[in-house]
């Protein structure tokens, strides 16, 4: 595999084209905004295609599905290369010698999620709880792209009311987990509008129910969670989704109460939740026809930028390390490689470390704005701003 990865990098100059990784879910309807043919969303017993994972080395932890579901593939002039295997076989070639010496892999997952109903109120385990089942925590951040249908419920529920966090919050939430028969648990959370071009940073341990806006997400490298909401989109979700990443021992001994260990009560009940976690684009580069902004920030675990170029505009960027990018709108070139938004297979690249730290010219060759999003893993951009509103 090492020689194949080296050949692919040599062939492309370190700018690797990625094929789309489509992921099905069987517990929610799709939003049908991923650009697929109508008949391609329904995968039978596997559910519906609701997500597209980007530059992914993460396996989708579904009840049923192929062994490589969620994994991205590098397109070459010969065979396709599994990105997870490629990084494992040639970490220094992909991530750079110094970074590979301190990081086992890319350590992040980018995705587009596209649901026809609000995602149920759920939580991701903090590091210590995830480790009990051999998994990673799952801090995550969202960006809501503009000019896309927002769906039926473009508002998200986050956290719990402060009085719950300040008291015995477990006793408030546990009855809903035990009964497992409705969605009334949502009354204990705040709802926030999903505003185009904005987003949120949601750390592991925070309860959340993302709304129906098409969302570009950047997160830790994991597919761990526990559902706290039984009724969603008109049906009762299997209670196995509550216990999905709970050890057999904790489930046997503690039952629903085991999940209370996951809840970060201080963060959930933060009276300044919005102020501390909203993500508003932070522009750091402006020139004629050029606008580049941080859209994922506030965490050392990942970061990301949105670049917008007017027709005919170009920019030369130098980054700090390996990253993948999604061309969201328009057409152009990245280091001489033709790209086109909205065309899976022509809209996704991974730029290896040694190429990324050299000048990369990005050119808009089309008649509309070229918009692309860059995704970085842990510790690559220590200068990214903190989350929340500027004070």
Report residues per predicted region.
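His/acidic/aromatic-lined binding-pocket segments of jelly-roll/cupin-type domains
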Residues: 110-112, 119, 140-143, 191-192, ...
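Double-stranded beta-helix
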Residues: 157-184, 216-266, 366-391
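Short acidic-glycine-tyrosine-enriched beta hairpin
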Residues: 189-201, 333-361
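Functionally critical, mid-to-C-terminal surface segments that flank or help form catalytic/ligand
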Residues: 256-320
């Amino acid at each position: 595999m090492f020689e194949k990865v080296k050949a692919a990098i040599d062939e492309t100059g370190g700018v690797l084209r990625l094929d789309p990784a489509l992921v099905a879910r069987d517990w929610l309807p799709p939003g049908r905004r991923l650009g697929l043919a109508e008949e391609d969303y329904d995968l039978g017993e596997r559910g519906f295609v609701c997500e597209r994972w980007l530059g992914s080395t993460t396996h989708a932890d579904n009840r049923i599905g192929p062994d490589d579901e969620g994994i991205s593939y590098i397109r070459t002039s010969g065979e396709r290369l599994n990105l997870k295997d490629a990084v494992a076989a040639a970490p220094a070639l992909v991530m750079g010698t110094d970074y590979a010496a301190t990081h086992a892999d890319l350590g992040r997952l980018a995705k587009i999620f596209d649901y026809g109903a609000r995602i149920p109120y759920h939580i991701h385990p903090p590091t210590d709880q995830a480790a009990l089942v051999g998994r990673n925590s799952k801090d995550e951040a969202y960006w809501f792209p503009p000019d896309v249908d927002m769906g039926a419920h473009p508002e998200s529920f986050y956290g719990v009311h402060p009085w719950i966090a300040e008291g015995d919050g477990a006793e408030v939430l546990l009855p809903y987990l035990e009964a497992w028969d409705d969605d009334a648990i949502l009354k204990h959370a705040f709802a926030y509008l999903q505003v185009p071009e904005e987003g949120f940073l949601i750390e592991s341990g925070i309860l959340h129910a993302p709304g129906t806006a098409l969302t570009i997400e950047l997160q830790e490298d994991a597919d761990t969670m526990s559902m706290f909401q039984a009724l969603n989109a008109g049906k009762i979700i299997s209670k196995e989704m509550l216990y999905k990443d709970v050890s057999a021992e904790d489930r046997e001994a503690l039952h629903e109460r085991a999940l209370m260990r996951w809840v970060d009560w201080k963060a959930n009940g933060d009276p300044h939740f919005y102020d501390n976690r909203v993500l508003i684009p932070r522009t750091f580069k402006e020139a004629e026809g050029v606008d580049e902004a941080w859209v994922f920030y506030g965490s050392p675990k990942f970061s990301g930028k949105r670049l917008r170029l007017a027709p005919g505009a170009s920019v030369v960027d130098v980054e700090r390390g390996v990253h993948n990018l999604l061309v969201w709108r328009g057409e152009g070139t990245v280091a001489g490689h033709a790209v086109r938004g909205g065309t899976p297979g022509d809209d996704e690249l991974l730029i290896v470390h040694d190429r990324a730290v050299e000048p990369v010219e990005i050119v808009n060759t089309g008649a509309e704005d070229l918009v692309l999003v860059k995704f970085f893993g842990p510790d690559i951009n220590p200068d990214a701003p903190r989350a929340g509103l500027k004070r």
